[in-house]
Amino acid sequence: MTDTSVLDQWKASFFVEDFLEKKTITRMVTQINCEFEEVVPSSNPDSQIEVEEVSLYTHMDYNEVFTPVSCLEKCSALQNQNQDLFIDDKGILFVSSRKHLPTLPTLLSRLKLFLVKDPLLDFKGQIFTEANFSRECFSLQETLEAFVKEDFCMDKVNFCQEKLEDTICLNEPSSFLIEYEFLIPPSLKPEIDIPSLSELKELLNPVPEIINYVDEKEKLFERDLTNKHGIEDIGDIKFSSTEILTIQSQSEPEECSKPGELEMPLTPLFLTCQHSSVNSLRTELQTFPLSPVCKINLLTAEESANEYYMMWQLERCRSPLNPFLLTVPRIQEPHSQYSVTDLKKIFSVKEESLVINLEKAEWWKQAGLNLKMMETLEHLNTYLCHDNLSSNDTKIEIFLPTKVLQLESCLEHKSHSSPIALIDEKSTNAHLSLPQKSPSLAKEVPDLCFSDDYFSDKGAAKEEKPKNDQEPVNRIIQKKENNDHFELDCTGPSIKSPSSSIIKKASFEHGKKQENDLDLLSDFIMLRNKYKTCTSKTEVTNSDEKHDKEACSLTLQEESPIVHINKTLEEINQERGTDSVIEIQASDSQCQAFCLLEAAASPILKNLVSLCTLPTANWKFATVIFDQTRFLLKEQEKVVSDAVRQGTIDEREMTFKHAALLHLLVTIRDVLLTCSLDTALGYLSKAKDIYNSILGPYLGDIWRQLEIVQFIRGKKPETNYKIQELQCQILSWMQSQQQIKVLIIIRMDSDGEKHFLIKILNKIEGLTLTVLHSNERKDFLESEGVLRGTSSCVVVHNQYIGADFPWSNFSFVVEYNYVEDSCWTKHCKELNIPYMAFKVILPDTVLERSTLLDRFGGFLLEIQIPYVFFASEGLLNTPDILQLLESNYNISLVERGCSESLKLFGSSECYVVVTIDEHTAIILQDLEELNYEKASDNIIMRLMALSLQYRYCWIILYTKETLNSEYLLTEKTLHHLALIYAALVSFGLNSEELDVKLIIAPGVEATALIIRQIADHSLMTSKRDPHEWLDKSWLKVSPSEEEMYLLDFPCINPLVAQLMLNKGPSLHWILLATLCQLQELLPEVPEKVLKHFCSITSLFKIGSSSITKSPQISSPQENRNQISTLSSQSSASDLDSVIQEHNEYYQYLGLGETVQEDKTTILNDNSSIMELKEISSFLPPVTSYNQTSYWKDSSCKSNIGQNTPFLINIESRRPAYNSFLNHSDSESDVFSLGLTQMNCETIKSPTDTQKRVSVVPRFINSQKRRTHEAKGFINKDVSDPIFSLEGTQSPLHWNFKKNIWEQENHPFNLQYGAQQTACNKLYSQKGNLFTDQQKCLSDESEGLTCESSKDETFWRELPSVPSLDLFRASDSNANQKEFNSLYFYQRAGKSLGQKRHHESSFNSGDKESLTGFMCSQLPQFKKRRLAYEKVPGRVDGQTRLRFF
């Protein structure tokens, strides 16, 4: 038999659905009070039939009168939620049917008894002790079921473990009401023993409603991220002891004899250690031991008594308890503890400027609350929560157990001098601290922390003057940053009150008097409010090496007590000697690199927050530490690995990638500030190679950005403050001591910085330097090797120091690359060796500003990059843009004239061509030019000319107004813009040769900015090394003669010309080089540019004498007696065919000045050697319509195009030799579709011109299908026109003896078959090539016809065809319409280099079309008969014309 109560048994089987009044009444015999009586049982079919055993504890009957008492009348909010728990009024038959209702013994007979074990026994069956009470702490990772199943026994009885909202005042009894109604019997006469409250609590087992608790807390947590709610009055903040106990561990020890006391905590409480369904919060768990002698009192005695009494009163609402409870008189006990608010009132302590904002999210901070950990005053230790993942970097106070007498002696020696600020804990990001020159450290950066070893000797004397003597606490609280969003944190005063003696660790005795406790608390409060007298901004820390190991294991950083009170800075320097950490300001390159890293990390942090990574909510790149990101990475790695096993990888992999990127960036940041930019770049380069498959592109962009910063640093050398400080320190040591031996420990792997350090140290007079390296076979240095040297300074790498290193032989140790928690700091202190470290910090300007990369350029516009660009002479007309580029963006411009091809399309004064790199150009076009006629045509033609030199072209249309924010777009301007856009659309759809983009800028300032952005974009997207791209030290401002020769090529821009001369051995070698050689020498130059260049150079024979001269061309000698006409070897065409046949090389020779009336052209037989410079222009100069020399022939006059944009200026004495280059790479002509109507001299009618338009794609497509079989180098595709140049055949010369054309051996000789005859016979000059030879045409050749010219075609000169390999049979795809667009002209007396062609016979079906091929105006030659021969080496029987 167990001692239990009726109430306990009734509660165990009392359910709503088993109400007895719902059952019908029948008679049955039951035993009640040892007597058999007939009882009316329930007729409910669900009821039990068998007679149950009557309780052995029932000795008397009860008269039951049920009166419904509703608790919901006072809590209307619970009515709607509990409608299902109500009993229908029809079923309540208390009065009318009470005679028929079963008695209490009948009800008790239904009960089943269960044995309950002793509540004072633990799970091992042993009685709880006080020691077990104080060390009970449960993990957050335990599930709710574990807490329910575990039998936790507490001395203090928790009757109300239901969740209490912070907003509900504890004075409201309704918050403690249960949610369903009780049937309260008015007269119960118990005659049994009253069970204890512990037993009642154990049997009732009230469980808090965890589900609602979690939901509300999650909502509260979400709201807390944006706008945290405040409360009405801080003085009304009260916490239930049961709530606090439930939050932390669900079973904290309390003595039953004393009421539960609540006090406003002075130390953090772990609100994160709550039962939440959020999985990520489980990582916040930390277990802390509780003091065995301390008692958690969170309220004053008075408040605790009130709450205790109120809970008893509320429990009386539970009707079954009323008869069993005795009246407990309220006893006024003396107060043993006071809240902070009461103590402030008692001691009249007021905080200055403590203005409490009800809407502020940091109300708990200003109230002195810090809800991180629950401890009492006697044992106040604050730690970083979330398993070392807290981003909190505020100054945290460490209060250790101290004896009363010691504290009183400390208080007697209060300092009255200007004290020194003390920091007690290492900062989580000490390397990001601000310099000492900050005017108000506590005001500007309240979260600044330094390490224990930190000591500042710079600027101490300057900052001894008090500034801002009294700094309000709320200012510091408002500016506090980087608190974890799920931690309620409190920032203490920025400057702690000092003490003159070291507070040693001790433990409090349990039996302390009440007065001593009160005095201790008052003294502590006074200490906390001494910040008002502290004025110095110099911060000094000192670490206590004898710290508590147990506490150190639970914290991220070492903790040190408060030290050094009433001593000046000089005295501290003398006592500490050189045992300090000197802060060094970061260099410009380090600041720039940090800004780039921060700009790259900002979007990553945002993405992590959006991916619900809770620890990163308040992280900032400047404050997050290595251990935090490493833990996050390991956590995400485990999540991903678990997801892989389950086969569900959604966004977890993306979260893992972001965590890895953030960790890498933080690591690079630490390496950057610890060592140097070079070391950080080396680490980043290795990481980029290792993680190339996952993070390669992203890390590649960051690597390029840091490479650019490194280049800027090389161009603008900066001061190394760290080496300067080291040099000054060594000189001061040498002056103070006669013999010193300094050990310098380095961590950097960069050889450049190491060599620079050694170079500076070697310059110090009287200092002998030794650099120690480890043996290849051994990892560490031997002690003998270190002692063998006699130098006064030893430099050794960190990793080479072993266990037997002779530390005692050194009088001073310098850690050149300081890191947090350095092992050498503690080691030197243990050995009592003077120690100094150099720590790099960032200025406040870098930490405060937010840096974002330019979206277009991909770089920071604040960082000036030393660009060097080429610009045309039109830039002189825009001095505003020139000044902005040079002053605001550090862009230097070198002037070069426009190419001859550009000068054909309007004056160069209204536009500027800026060469960004070998691929990119910018055209600065004034919008005013678009008001003129033919403006769009000129712009498009300029693009056509630039397409030979560049692959990307940006057109910036700007207005010259400086502050113009609007566009002055007239009707003509809009019309031309529409035409330009239409042409650009065709470019973008049909061309891979030129990518054109058009931008309209509102003014010169926006124009200069766009140029900088385009330059950044080109630099970031280039595949070249940033150093190579930016280095333009080899450029020459003044153009050389060789450069001018190269600029005559229409495909060479000024940058490529100087690049060729800089890399090439000589100009002669460049002109003779093949395409493969040029591509190997100039990989950065576009391939099409080199192809065009080789296509031109392969046409000429360049002798050895032309090294310093322009290349010369050997042309055939002409004999007027034998030759009256000589056709051009280069098969030139008019400009219309040039534009359409953009992929072929044509040379347009100047026309004769006059045309004979008899329709014969008198040719000049004078031949001369042409210079390359004379044939540079691929298009003739622009002339007006009235400057054209009209042909006297009526057929010519009628066919001259009237709508052509430009005409040819015919000169007699100085012909213009214009060359157009091969455009072999383009799959479709960029300019052909929109520019076919532009021709120099239109011979055909407009209908024929339309026909030529349709021919263009066929010409382009046919070129793709043509290939060459060559032993030598192939530098050009086969073209469609009959007389276009094919291959790179060497020039031919005239043999007077044999009266034939002969080919000379040349390096560019190209053979089209297995064998070729060394001498290619040509037609005799006396013979007529195409008259009356129709019978000789072969049926194999087809597609090569010339239109019969009755009255329309005008042939001024006969195009002779030497080495007439017209087409192979497979290549004869041209038709007669295609040849209608080809016209051939010859410069009298001169011809260009010849190229070999395939020989093919004409189709007999095209006989008639050849009759008009000979111009009737030419002298008739002697007719010769055509003969055929087989091509040597051909197996397919291919034939060719045989020449006599």
UniProtKB/Swiss-Prot annotation:
Keywords: Chromosome, Disease variant, DNA-binding, Hydrolase, Meiosis. Its EC number is 3.6.-.-. One of its GO terms (biological process) is resolution of meiotic recombination intermediates. GO terms for cellular component: chromosome; condensed nuclear chromosome. GO terms for molecular function: ATP hydrolysis activity; single-stranded DNA binding. Transmembrane segments: none annotated. Residues 1106-1129 are annotated as: Disordered. Pfam families: DUF5587. The keyword DNA-binding applies. Residues 1106-1117 have a biased composition (Low complexity). It is found in: Chromosome. It is an enzyme of class 3 (hydrolase). It comes from the Eukaryota. The keyword Thylakoid does not apply. It is linked to Spermatogenic failure 75: An autosomal recessive disorder characterized by male infertility due to non-obstructive azoospermia resulting from maturation arrest at the spermatocyte stage. ATPase required during meiosis for the formation of crossover recombination intermediates. Binds DNA: preferentially binds to single-stranded DNA and DNA branched structures. Does not show nuclease activity in vitro, but shows ATPase activity, which is stimulated by the presence of single-stranded DNA. Plays a key role in homologous recombination and crossing-over in meiotic prophase I in male and female germ cells. Required for proper synaptonemal complex assembly and homologous chromosome pairing. Requiref for recruitment TEX11 and MSH4 to recombination intermediates. Interacts with TEX11. Interacts with SPO16. Belongs to the XPF family. Highly divergent. This is Protein shortage in chiasmata 1 ortholog. It comes from Homo sapiens. The lineage of its organism: Eukaryota, Metazoa, Chordata, Craniata, Vertebrata.
